[in-house]
Each structure stands twice: as C-alpha cells, then as structure tokens.
A protein has these predicted regions:
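Bacterial N-terminal signal peptides
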Residues: 2-12
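Boundary at the C-terminal end of the N-terminal hydrophobic targeting segment
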Residues: 18-21
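Aromatic- and carboxylate-lined catalytic core of secreted/periplasmic carbohydrate-active enzymes
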Residues: 24-28, 49, 272-276, 283-286, ...
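Active-site mouth of glycoside hydrolases
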Residues: 25-243, 250-259
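Active-site flanking residues adjacent to catalytic metal/cofactor-binding acidic residues
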Residues: 178, 182, 279, 426
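Catalytic-core region of carbohydrate-active enzymes that cleave or remodel glycosidic bonds
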Residues: 205, 226-330
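Short strand-edge motifs at loop-to-beta-strand transitions and within beta-strands
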Residues: 444-446
C-alpha cells in the first residue's frame, strides 16, 4: 500500500491534558525483553512467556492525531486487545504533524531537529511512545516509508545518521519494535536499508527488528541472511482472487491473491528459519484492490479469515488494519482510498466488528500450550480450497481447525494424545464457546449446522485430550481462559 494522502487540518497548540490512567495489570516488559523462541518460530519474553503479536495499523498516528486523540486511540487499542501499533515515523521528508512541527527542520542535520523550548515533532512522537507504554502497547516503528527511499530523499550516509538518532532516542524505551521498509521491495536501494538497520542495531541492543515489504512479498526474499533482521513480515495485500491488475511481474501464482497462508511456507523455505507474520493483510472497509472506489469492500468476516488462515499456518501473530484508522480519517482529512465524504472517522471505525474481534484469536492462541504448536493440514481429510479451505493447527494434546464457511469437516483425532477428546466450537465473531461433548479417537465427521450461526459462520473446532483442562466444559467464552503458562515476573 502506498500512502500519498491529501491533508486539510486545523492547526491547534498542544494543551495540558489529563491522560488516562494506566491499566491495572502487569507491564509486559517486566517479563524481560522480547526475543525469538528457541524453535525460531515464535516471539517470547526473556522469562519464557509467549508474546502473541496482535497489531493494529495506525500508520499516520504521529502526523494526524493530537495528544488527546492519540491517548484516546491507544486506550481503545488496549481495550480491544492489541499489543502492537504499527506507525510511520516519517511518511514524507519532511513530515509535518498536526501542530505544524516538521520532522527535519534542517534536513538530515538531526542535531537541530529537536530545539529547546519547542514542542517539536520528536517530542510529540515521544509522547505517543510513552502513552503506548502506559497501555502496555509496543510501537512498531517504521523509520521511514519506502516511497521516500525510492524517491532518493535519503541516501546511505543520511540513513546511518538517522538510524543513530533514532536508536539513541528510543533504545531505552521498553516498548519499541523496529520496522525497516514500508511497502517497498528490498532490492530498491538496499544500501539505504542496510545502513539504517545496522546503525540502529549498533546502538540499540534491546529491541527486535523486521522489514515491511511490498504487497505479495515476504521480507525473506531479500533479507533472510541479513544480520539485523530478527523476524520476517509479509504483506499479503488487498486484492481478491484473480485481481492481478495487469502487473507484468507477479511474485505469486495467479488466482492466489487471498491465500495469505501460503506466505508462511514460502518464508520458511528461506534459511535460517525465523518467526513470521502478516504485517498488512486486507483492511476492513477498504475497497477491494484499493484503487477503485466502486469495488466492494472487505468486511469483518474477511479480516477474520485472513487472521486465522495466517496464524493457523504458523504465523507468530497478526496485524489488523482498517481503512479509516490507518489513515486517521476525520473531518477535514480527505481519504486516499474509497469515496471522499462517505468514509467514517477513525474514532467511529473503532466500533466496527472486525476491529473488536481480533482479541478472540489472541485469547485462543494463548489458551493452549504455545511453543509446541505447528501447522498440520493432515489433520483434516479433504481440506478444501479458496473459501472452503479448512486451516488446521495442533500441539501435542490439542488441535484446532478454522472453517470460514464449511459446516462439515472430517478430522483425524489420532494426531494428538488421548484416548478420549473433548470438543468445542468457537464462534470467531464473538469468541463464544459451545461444548460439543466427549468422544473417542480415530477419524471423525463433524456436522456443525446446530452451532454455526450467521453468514459465513466462521469459527474454530477445538479438540483437546480429555485429560487436559485448558478449557472448561462450562466455559462460554474464550476470553475467560487462563493462559496456559505464567512464568515469573523478572522484577519480583
């Protein structure tokens, strides 16, 4: 996705505000720094507690929201279950924020970027990072958008200086994750990305780093052996099946545009294996394919499908996006995608279904033994194609099958331990659990007509060794599950 958006705002001075109180829960970084798991497929804290990345896309947060708005946005992200917000530090060179402050007042001489006595561009970014920490949210910090690198607005020497500036400013913040790239192929000025990434890593030894690629690419295509990359990211993008749009060079097979699960396998084909996630799937309420406002729009059920397909294929998390939120649309701000005058403001979009339904996926993944989970399509007999695909994953003593629109499935229960299994159906749109009963082993057929409601009626069949109690039989929602492991707080 390329962001080149019209901006019309009323400038206001920063005012004293009463920020919302911190949530009454432990700080995630009390578990130590984020690191890569021993099996190289997940993210975790130093004390062994799993970290399931659930990201929201807030690209233009630093540019378009004032202090009050930023606090409101981050508070609601936390309440909706998000633990990462992806932002652009620089969308342009220079970038202006809502207070009229610019990012590069003296070009790439960043010694003059933060003058005393001024609420500078960087002071406002500091505020956003600190408020995110207040809500236990990590900031996925895209240092500079790819279009600016492609246009030659920064060279390798400038990137090195910029990387040192960023690292020195944020290396001691607990809630930073560095993101190189920004909707760009890695072979476009790779010397700039190498210089920027290596400069940050030379100073900052506390935070993980990845790369956000162009649509239908994975960062592993260019950076699999880069010393600075800790985990991979792919952008499955915003196109429907068959929407090639005349591209002469196409990095995926025709008519596979929506199959975001395939990027996990293609990423892991590169060595060494690293964790991977979809950093930009189709956004809720954005025109299908982005650029034709007359197209239909991606719905809540679509964004759920992308999330479950990707995670059940082995992703270490998932990033959600919404057309209005990623642009931070509000009165006076023109949309870059859709029909101007008909788009909803970002703060209204936070009520949309898809935005509020991602937390059920996170809760489900943290309910089961985390690090033993693998994708395993052999669980299902005849797993279907396209929208009929049954996505399967399992641990040693549990298995899960996500169905987008299928009301029947044949499952091989011998793939997990236990002579008897307990079964549940989880509604992906509500997180509601229905206990289906206890049965034996072998290959079994499941008919879900009685528990599937609505259209498409997507959800997850859960089977657990009956000797385990990850979910109770009388449990009605996945949100009340107790995380399977609670390693000690390193500050205790």
């Amino acid at each position: 996705m390329t962001l080149g958006l019209a901006l019309s705002i009323t400038m206001t001075a920063p005012t004293a505000i009463t920020a919302s109180a911190a949530p009454k829960e432990p700080r995630p970084w009390n578990n130590g720094k984020l690191i890569v798991s021993a099996n190289h497929r997940f993210l975790q804290f130093e004390n062994g507690q799993p970290f399931f990345w659930l990201g929201d896309t807030g690209w233009l947060l630093p540019e378009r929201l004032n202090r009050d708005e930023a606090d409101y946005y981050l508070k609601h992200c936390h309440e909706a279950g998000y633990n990462v917000v992806q932002i652009q530090v620089l969308n342009d060179v220079p970038t202006f924020n809502i207070y009229g402050e610019m990012s590069n007042p003296s070009g790439w001489d960043l010694s003059k970027a933060d003058p005393d006595g001024t609420y500078s561009y960087w002071d406002h970014l500091d505020y956003i990072v600190d408020r995110a920490a207040n809500y236990n949210i990590y900031i996925g910090m895209v240092a500079i958008w790819g279009s600016q690198v492609k246009s030659g607005h920064i060279n390798a020497d400038e990137a090195k200086a910029y990387g040192q500036f960023l690292a020195n400013r944020y290396k001691d913040k607990p809630n930073i994750i560095w993101i190189m790239g920004g909707d760009i192929q890695g072979d476009i000025h790779p010397e700039v990305w190498d210089a920027l990434a290596n400069a940050i890593k030379a100073v900052d030894h506390n935070h993980l780093m990845t790369y956000h690629p162009r649509g239908r690419y994975t960062s592993a295509r260019w950076w699999s052996k880069a010393p600075w990359i800790d985990f991979h990211m792919f952008q499955s993008g915003h196109r429907r099946y068959g929407q090639r749009m005349g591209n002469a060079v196409y990095p995926i097979p025709d008519n596979t545009e929506e199959d975001n699960w395939m990027y996990v396998d293609s990423t892991w084909a590169h060595k060494p294996i690293r964790p991977v996630l979809d950093g930009e799937p189709s956004y809720e309420d954005i025109p299908i394919g982005l650029h034709d406002p007359n197209e239909g729009r991606w719905k809540a059920s679509d964004v759920r499908r992308y999330a479950y397909w990707s995670v059940f294929a082995g992703s270490c998390g998932h990033t959600y996006g919404h057309n209005s939120i990623m642009q931070m649309l509000k009165p006076g701000v023109a949309t870059g995608y859709g029909t101007d005058g008909k788009e909803k403001p970002w703060y209204v979009a936070m009520n949309d279904s898809g935005y509020n339904e991602m937390k059920y996926l996170k809760a489900l993944m943290l309910t089961m033994p985390y690090f033993a989970r693998i994708p395993d399509q052999s669980i299902v007999i005849g797993n279907g194609t396209r929208y009929g695909r049954l996505a399967a994953t399992r641990g040693d003593d549990y298995l899960m099958v996500y169905s987008y629109n299928s009301k029947t499935m044949r499952v091989d229960l011998r793939k997990i331990s236990g002579k008897k299994k307990n079964f549940w159906w989880m509604d992906a749109s509500t997180g509601a659990l229905t206990f289906l009963g206890t049965d034996g082993n072998g290959v079994q057929d499941f008919s879900l007509d009685k528990v599937v409601t609505g259209s498409p009626g997507d959800g997850v069949l859960i089977a657990v060794d009956a000797s385990k109690e990850y979910i109770s039989k009388n449990q009605t929602t996945i949100l009340t599950s107790k995380p399977w492991a609670t390693p000690r707080d390193l500050n205790e």
